[in-house]
Amino acid sequence: MQCALYDAGRCRSCQWITQPIPEQLSAKTADLKNLLADFPVEEWCAPVSGPEQGFRNKAKMVVSGSVEKPLLGMLHRDGTPEDLCDCPLYPASFAPVFAALKPFIARAGLTPYNVARKRGELKYILLTESQSDGGMMLRFVLRSETKLAQLRKALPWLQEQLPQLKVITVNIQPVHMAIMEGETEIYLTEQQALAERFNDVPLWVRPQSFFQTNPAVASQLYATARDWVRQLPVKHMWDLFCGVGGFGLHCATPDMQLTGIEIAPEAIACAKQSAAELGLTRLQFQALDSTQFATAQGEVPELVLVNPPRRGIGKPLCDYLSTMAPRFIIYSSCNAQTMAKDVRELPGYRIERVQLFDMFPHTAHYEVLTLLVKQ
């Protein structure tokens, strides 16, 4: 992938950009095989990749510069701002949004937050696009509600310029730290969730719910999990750390009992909405801590699917699964190091199948799906 920002030394986020994709995949596969070298793996499936540019459905832009000439992008370690509107990871549909946002920031008087001086209001712009209908969700992350009335007043102009903006919110993040969002979310549109669709499964994205940033590869990840589950004799499963329900909604059948657990209430609201649309009455989604939920149960289903954050599922949940011994565990991981550590804590299981998903091209990161079977 050619990137003018990288070539000019202005951005180094894509550290592997000079390597062709096949070389990147080989290096990631070698890393994964090295991490799982102590475990016999019955089947290594071919890695899955997607487009090498324009694949991201989300932009997280630090706002800097002045109210008249805002910059959308990032800050270097020395505090120097860098405009990343031309980043080739973003689809072409993002360019007109960025172009309209710059004059809008001036119209609404949203002074960019100055980190060094701890002054200003507008900290971040967060943009998400739906692959199914091109609808977008835009979030303004502000330090306080001081400029909220001004923003509301100027908003009709922006909506006229960008009718694709279906959900618009203000998030209040008052702390002087590099934290992307605060707890308070103020909706400026009637619509509160963005409609998405993977493999004919309706999914919903709300402002404070996690959603994969590479839809082309994520949809293949969910479809693969569905195919693996359909090959197993499973009538009851848990989907732990379930997010908006992507895995569970793909894997569920009308006669399957499924419980999805996720700590974020916003994500659970999305999952429930999807389940209702699909008419799946035996699906239950709850906003709870996944480890606390599981370890409080006296019995387990035939299959437990886990999709934890980078830290992994951790020893307490590993110990519980080892003791309760569900017949199958499907582990989806964005950090193969912690997954390998967790698998070591599950000595009663063998690895039946592993597949790498190149969710993050041009970086060392990748997603991996692993099927563990009780010995």
Swiss-Prot record:
Q: Which terms in the Gene Ontology molecular function aspect does this entry carry?
A: 4 iron, 4 sulfur cluster binding; iron ion binding; rRNA (uridine-C5-)-methyltransferase activity
Read off the InterPro entries from this record.
Answer: 23SrRNA_MeTrfase_RlmC, MeTrfase_TrmA_AS, MeTrfase_TrmA_CS, SAM-dependent_MTases_sf, U5_MeTrfase_fam
- Tell me which residues bind [4Fe-4S] cluster: C3, C11, C14, C87
Report the record's disulfide bonds. Answer: none
Is Iron found in the keyword set? yes
Keyword Ribosomal protein assigned = no
Q: Which UniProt keywords apply?
A: 4Fe-4S, Iron, Iron-sulfur, Metal-binding, Methyltransferase, rRNA processing, S-adenosyl-L-methionine, Transferase
- Residue positions of the active site: C334
Q: Give TM segment ranges.
A: none
Entry function:
Catalyzes the formation of 5-methyl-uridine at position 747 (m5U747) in 23S rRNA.
Task: Read off the NCBIfam families from this record.
Answer: meth_trns_rumB (TIGR02085)
Q: Which family does it belong to?
A: Belongs to the class I-like SAM-binding methyltransferase superfamily. RNA M5U methyltransferase family. RlmC subfamily.
Q: Which PANTHER family match?
A: RNA M5U METHYLTRANSFERASE (PTHR11061), TRNA (URACIL(54)-C(5))-METHYLTRANSFERASE (PTHR11061:SF30)
The name on file for this protein is 23S rRNA (uracil(747)-C(5))-methyltransferase RlmC
Originating gene: rlmC
